[in-house]
């Protein structure tokens, strides 16, 4: 039988305002990247070790307020409480979502492909860092019709993976870019723009040109990982997925290795599907689409290094919470019930 990751509650937060849901999450380590010295940055070393010291670690949630105009907010959760950082209405772009990323003890939002709004210190006065090659006529990297998506990505270095959609817009992602960000020089530029190679997947659809959809991306130890939830253009909530897979890919989207690949899900006659989200740890969070599938609607973890699944045991009274991120021993959970009702910061008690 499968091993189980057991969680215990450190702290529960009940937001005082009405928020929609968790768009994406991150973690801040207690360490400033500047303290690590510029040398390590030149070498592209990890600014944020996956060990995530418990000392001063904070969790981040990108969400939106229920009240009109539905402004974005970043919630910063620590053992002392919850801080809300409201993002201005200039973030409400009809085409582009903001992308949250974290860097040591700082975090940023990539805004409309063109700039980074970078929060350091007490987060009261963010810096605006323009992305050098985002504006025509210099933009050779991102196509004009690429739209930025908020989907959770993780990076342990300078290259930040970002999900995009182009040509047709369903609020999905079938393309990705890598943003090279130097937090010391305060410079950023787009490095590449690609789709995932569809023919590498056993159950790809030859009848269409649709690239695999991307749920989440991760850069770790100079390797790029992508989780795809198949190619279907129809509603997966209604019809289920065609396939899902976890792959190590090149910046050009070439599939180097498949770590996980489902069967053809449409063949079984029963709707199914699993979404994947990378974390600040070795684990990928797998969330089933339907409650009546083999997993009974329960999330699982997949270890990238050991290539094995784990079950998750939530703390008592929190079985309706979903897991959103992991960093070292810390886990970030949330309860969604027609809005973001509770947030949990939990600790990994052990694996049984």
Please describe what each predicted stretch is:
Residues 1-40:
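An edge-strand/N-cap motif at the start of beta-rich repeat modules
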Residues 8, 26-27, 56-65, 99-111, ...:
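Short beta-strand elements that form the blades of beta-propeller/WD-repeat-like
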Residues 8-13, 83-89, 127-136, 189-197, ...:
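Beta-propeller fold detector
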Residues 18-24, 43-51, 91-104, 135-154, ...:
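Repeated scaffold domains used in trafficking and secretory/extracellular systems
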Residues 67-74, 114-120, 168-179, 233-247, ...:
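Structural motif
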Residues 77-80, 121-124, 181-185, 250-253, ...:
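Short loop/turn segments that connect beta-strands within beta-propeller blades
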Residues 229-230, 264-299:
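Loop/turn-rich, solvent-exposed surfaces of beta-rich toroidal or solenoidal domains
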Residues 321-352:
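Blade-level signature of beta-propeller repeat domains, shared across WD40, Kelch, NHL, RCC1
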């Amino acid at each position: 039988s499968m091993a189980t990751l057991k969680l215990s509650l450190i702290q529960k937060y009940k937001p005082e305002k009405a928020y929609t849901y968790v768009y994406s999450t991150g973690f801040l380590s207690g360490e400033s990247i500047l303290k690590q010295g510029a040398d390590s940055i030149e070498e592209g070393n990890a600014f944020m070790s996956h060990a995530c010291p418990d000392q001063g670690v904070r969790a981040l949630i990108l969400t939106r307020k229920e009240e009109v105009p539905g402004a974005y907010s970043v919630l910063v959760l620590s053992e002392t409480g919850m801080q809300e950082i409201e993002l201005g209405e200039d973030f409400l772009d009809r085409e582009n979502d903001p992308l949250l990323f974290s860097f040591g003890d700082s975090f940023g939002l990539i805004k409309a492909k063109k700039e980074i709004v970078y929060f350091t210190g007490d987060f009261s006065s963010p810096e605006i860092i323009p992305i050098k090659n985002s504006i025509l006529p210099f933009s050779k990297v991102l196509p004009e019709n690429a739209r930025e998506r908020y989907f959770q990505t993780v990076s342990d270095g300078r290259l930040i993976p970002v999900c995009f959609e182009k040509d047709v817009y369903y609020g999905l992602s079938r393309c990705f870019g890598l943003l090279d960000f130097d937090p010391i020089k305060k410079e950023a530029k787009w490095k590449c723009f690609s789709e995932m190679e569809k023919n590498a997947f056993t159950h790809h659809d030859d009848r269409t040109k649709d690239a695999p959809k991307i749920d989440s991306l991760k850069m770790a130890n100079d390797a790029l990982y992508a989780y795809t939830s198949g190619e279907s253009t129809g509603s997966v909530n209604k019809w289920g997925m065609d396939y899902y897979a976890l792959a190590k890919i090149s910046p050009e989207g070439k599939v180097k290795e498949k770590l996980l690949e489902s069967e053809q899900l449409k063949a079984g006659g029963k709707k199914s599907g699993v979404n994947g989200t990378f974390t600040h740890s070795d684990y990928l969070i797998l969330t089933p689409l339907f409650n009546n599938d083999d997993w009974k609607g329960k999330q699982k973890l997949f270890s990238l290094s050991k290539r094995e699944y784990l079950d998750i045991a939530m703390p008592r009274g929190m079985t309706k919470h979903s897991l959103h991120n992991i960093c070292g021993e810390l886990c970030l959970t949330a309860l969604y019930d027609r809005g973001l009702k509770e947030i949990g910061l939990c600790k990994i008690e052990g694996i049984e």
